[in-house]
Amino acid sequence: MIKSAILVLEDGTQFHGRAIGAEGAAVGEVVFNTSMTGYQEILTDPSYSRQIVTLTYPHIGNVGVNSVDKESLKVQAQGLVIRDLPLLTSNFRCEETLSDYLKRHNIVAIADIDTRKLTRLLREKGSQNGCIIAGKQIDAQVALEKAQAFPGLEGMDLAKEVTTKQIYPWLQGSWKLAGGLPEDKQEQDLPYHVVAYDFGAKRNILRMLVDRGCRLTVVPAQTSAEDVLKLNPDGIFLSNGPGDPAPCGYAIDAVKTLLETEIPIFGICLGHQLLALASGAETMKMKFGHHGGNHPVKDLECNVVMITAQNHGFAVDEKSLPSNLRVTHKSLFDGTLQGIHRTDKPAFSFQGHPEASPGPHETASLFDHFIELIEQYCQKNNRHNTK
């Protein structure tokens, strides 16, 4: 039986459609993502915590879902908005339909609405809070009240909500089409010990670090710098994550302390913003953010343009950069800051997602630069695990 659903934005705009997930209500910031593929990776990306994701590509669900293409243990997005859900799924890796997957994870979703109209509205007015109600009792006024009552992401510390609760090792490399997910690598085959802060880390980031010889110790977001240093790392990674970086004072303080050492530091997405804040810069809320797999970014040092995957609603304010930070990358969509490098420390960061998943891998060389810094650190300090 077809069940109705409604999406109501905080400005009162209504979109009526069909429920394709769980019954109930979902409230969050409504954003749009322009990726054509990778909807399962998007749904399971912790950076989408407290957000309702609108996918602009018209057909979503064609290939179903499987047990491999996930970036975390569960669906992280608050809700899903799409144009059309195909009646059939067709892929040799399909284990479940998208609709069944959403219901199993209790995710409210709506289809059969004009996603082009919604996207244009979000571009013109900026990201808005919204509410999806699905099921038998559809009340637009209740949805509006819920949307307007949502406080918004600015000032909200979500990293401590999505982070791991305990330290764990990660030794698994990247997935291959022929063999699927590989077995964990042996520690003796991974010469570099990297401590990875989990602010909402995507699994593909961890896998790409392992591919380059890193054995990872993943630690909770609120782990102190002192506890990290006790682990004796060769490098420190600051992961992606959701929400506003400014309230994450515990992380900013930890990074400040870690910057007093000579241990290489690499940050992605939220980790990029935290490195900037710890260095004395400021961040700002964007109008509608960057979400998609087709964003052109210029590498200012190599003078090349790369197509990147992006997922963030906050950015580092370039005007606030101190003298010890140099700009390395900028967005060609809106000129916002995309990359920084400390001039006095082996620390750098990137706003986009070089691991993609989904998206292009044109900035994967950033992982290689991190390894170069680690090798230099190990050689300089005569550490036993130098290649």
Curated annotation (Swiss-Prot):
Residues reported in the UniProt entry to bind L-glutamine: S47, G241, G243, L270, Q273, N311, G313, F314
Domain Glutamine amidotransferase type-1: 193-380
GO biological process, one term: 'de novo' pyrimidine nucleobase biosynthetic process
Keyword ATP-binding (UniProt): yes
EC numbers, comma separated: 6.3.5.5
UniProt entry keywords in alphabetical sequence: Amino-acid biosynthesis, Arginine biosynthesis, ATP-binding, Glutamine amidotransferase, Ligase, Nucleotide-binding, Pyrimidine biosynthesis
Active-site residues from the entry: C269, H353, E355
Region (CPSase): 1-189
Pathway the protein acts in: Amino-acid biosynthesis; L-arginine biosynthesis; carbamoyl phosphate from bicarbonate: step 1/1; Pyrimidine metabolism; UMP biosynthesis via de novo pathway; (S)-dihydroorotate from bicarbonate: step 1/3
InterPro entries assigned: Anth_synth/Amidotransfase (IPR050472), CarbamoylP_synth_ssu (IPR006274), CarbamoylP_synth_ssu_N (IPR002474), CarbP_synth_ssu_N_sf (IPR036480), Class_I_gatase-like (IPR029062), CPSase_GATase1 (IPR035686), GATASE (IPR017926)
Family affiliation: Belongs to the CarA family.
HAMAP family: CPSase_S_chain (MF_01209)
Job description of the protein: Small subunit of the glutamine-dependent carbamoyl phosphate synthetase (CPSase). CPSase catalyzes the formation of carbamoyl phosphate from the ammonia moiety of glutamine, carbonate, and phosphate donated by ATP, constituting the first step of 2 biosynthetic pathways, one leading to arginine and/or urea and the other to pyrimidine nucleotides. The small subunit (glutamine amidotransferase) binds and cleaves glutamine to supply the large subunit with the substrate ammonia.
NCBIfam families the UniProt entry points to: CPSaseIIsmall, PRK12838.1
Quaternary data: Composed of two chains; the small (or glutamine) chain promotes the hydrolysis of glutamine to ammonia, which is used by the large (or ammonia) chain to synthesize carbamoyl phosphate. Tetramer of heterodimers (alpha,beta)4.
Stated name of the protein: Carbamoyl phosphate synthase small chain
Gene (UniProt): carA
